[in-house]
Amino acid sequence: MLSIFNIWGTFNRVLFFLSLTVSLAGLAGNTLLLWHLGLRIKKGPFNTYLLHLAAADFLFLSCQVGFSIAKIASGYEDTLYFPVTFLWFAVGLWLLAAFIVDCCLSYMFPSFCGPNCRPRYTSFVLCLVIWALTMLAVLLPANACGLLYNRMSLLVCLKYHWVSVVWLGVLASTACGASMFLLVFGNCCSSQPPSKFCKLAQCSGILLFFCRLPLVFYWCLRPVIKFLLPFFFPLATLLACIDSSAKPLLYYLKGRQLRKEPLQVALNRALGEESQSSSGGISLPMSRV
């Protein structure tokens, strides 16, 4: 029995330090990404989402590093660790869902939902609304369920938690469905190839499915999973850190054309909002008609 506890303790420590290492690397990448998106690249509807998403990932990884260092120093985990880190994680999930759905609608209906068919600051205003609403959607159930303080009201907790579970389920399923649509129909059923932002949405949707959904499941079923699968939370945390840290590398790889191309050139190519043709949309190639 003692050896089982030793194995579990070693496994938990390995996941903890892996998460810390990935978070530190992701902080460096998202810092560079924020600098390029914020100061060096002209803003447009799509890269506005990515700028706010990078900010949410930066805050998530910063809190991850800060609470991890505090745990190393004090020897115990702060009670605010999970609700605070999940807050920025949820902001990123909502922003990612908005970005993927916007790319999907622009691809399906370029004449009505394209970048040139909307008010200039639509994406910016939507991002601000997402930041504000996520604060309420996470902090209210966290407070009612005793995650922020030790006071808990069972009926109020169940009511708020049920609303947050439905909200997260709708966000995750919408984002996964839209990215799957872009992946299948964009590559098989259209004569117009997907734009670079649609391709980024496809890759981001795959990352979301494998790396973000586990932490969403943990939030929804926290008491049950914590009791039955104690290793699930550190593993889900590691996957969430990988997702938040991988995006700068993903953007660089999507924008790079030459082997030793400068970072700024690759990011400008991947995230710049140059004018794109509005002749997209879903249509069968002539060879298939």
Curated annotation (Swiss-Prot):
Gene3D superfamilies: Rhodopsin 7-helix transmembrane proteins. GO terms for molecular function: G protein-coupled receptor activity. GO terms for biological process: G protein-coupled receptor signaling pathway. Its main location: membrane. SUPFAM superfamilies: Family A G protein-coupled receptor-like. Keywords: Cell membrane, G-protein coupled receptor, Membrane, Receptor, Transducer, Transmembrane, Transmembrane helix. GO terms for cellular component: plasma membrane. The chain crosses the membrane at residues 14-34, 50-70, 81-101, 124-144, 165-185, 201-221, 223-243. InterPro entries: GPCR_Rhodpsn, MRGPCRFAMILY, MRGPCRG. It is a multi-pass membrane protein. Residues 35-49, 102-123, 186-200, 244-289 are cytoplasmic. Residues 1-13, 71-80, 145-164, 222 are extracellular. It is found in: Cell membrane. Belongs to the G-protein coupled receptor 1 family. Mas subfamily. Orphan receptor. May regulate nociceptor function and/or development, including the sensation or modulation of pain. This is Mas-related G-protein coupled receptor member G. It comes from Rattus norvegicus (Rat).
